Regions:
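Cytoplasmic/organellar membrane-interface segments at the starts of transmembrane helices
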Residues: 100-102, 156-221
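Hydrophobic transmembrane alpha-helices and their helix-loop junctions in integral membrane proteins
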Residues: 1-162
Length: 221
């Protein structure tokens, strides 16, 4: 049934990947942006599983790990920013790099890590495995899903530029405090985990590959 009806779910997941990324581009609430980004990233997990091969499924597990860490980091930073500014509206935030440099730098790291460390590695593993599928239909949808990488770069870079740089337009934000030591410790731990997964993925991808192999072998029976 998975092989016969998988193409239906492939279309649905491919749409969710691209639609989620586009939806994140037009949101003005920081939490909504992160939520729609999660729709896109979680869609990639099911997209990879539907390819039914070891490489793609390894990428799916990496994506779940990466997404869990990245989402926790983003929501933690958003919560810390909201706790100080009392707003999540992108249009009301600007110039935070000068006001709360630690939180701002961590937000930049989180955004770039989503594009270039653990997030990128997981997605590339998924797309590499997807292109290994012998069916042209699956490869076409892989190309469509690949566009989400570019869209993700657009909304993350635009968001970073909007809320962190420029001139602060709200005078009440000028006196806000930066992160406390408790907050810094929590954020640094998450960043360290993201960096470890992104810069040395081989230490866990091998274990994941061995674990998913018996499952993917069932698809070929």
């Amino acid at each position: 049934a998975a092989q016969e009806l998988g193409w239906i779910f492939l279309i649905l997941t491919g749409i969710s990947v691209v639609y989620g990324a586009f939806s994140a581009c037009v949101q003005t609430d920081l939490k909504y942006i992160n939520a729609y980004s999660s729709v896109s990233h979680c869609g990639l997990v099911l997209f990879a599983i539907l390819m039914m091969n070891q490489t793609a499924c390894t990428g799916a597990v990496l994506q779940m790990l990466s997404h869990g860490l990245m989402t926790a980091l983003f929501f933690a930073l958003i919560g810390m920013i909201y706790g100080r500014t009392h707003t999540r509206d992108v249009r009301e935030l600007s110039g935070l790099m000068k006001i709360m440099p630690f939180l701002a730098v961590c937000y930049v790291i989180a955004g770039l890590a989503n594009l270039g460390l653990s997030g990128f590695i997981a997605e590339m593993t998924i797309f590499t495995g997807s292109f290994q599928h012998p069916d042209t239909f699956h490869r076409v949808w892989t190309v469509i899903a690949c566009s989400s990488i570019v869209i993700t770069a657009v909304y993350i870079l635009r968001l970073v530029g909007k809320i962190l740089y420029g001139t602060c337009t709200n005078k009440h934000h000028l006196t806000l405090s930066d992160a406390t030591w408790d907050e810094r410790t929590a954020v640094i731990i998450l960043i360290a985990c993201v960096a470890a997964l992104g810069m040395a993925p081989w230490w866990i991808s091998g274990m994941i590959g061995d674990s998913v192999l018996p499952i993917t072998d069932l698809f070929t029976i």
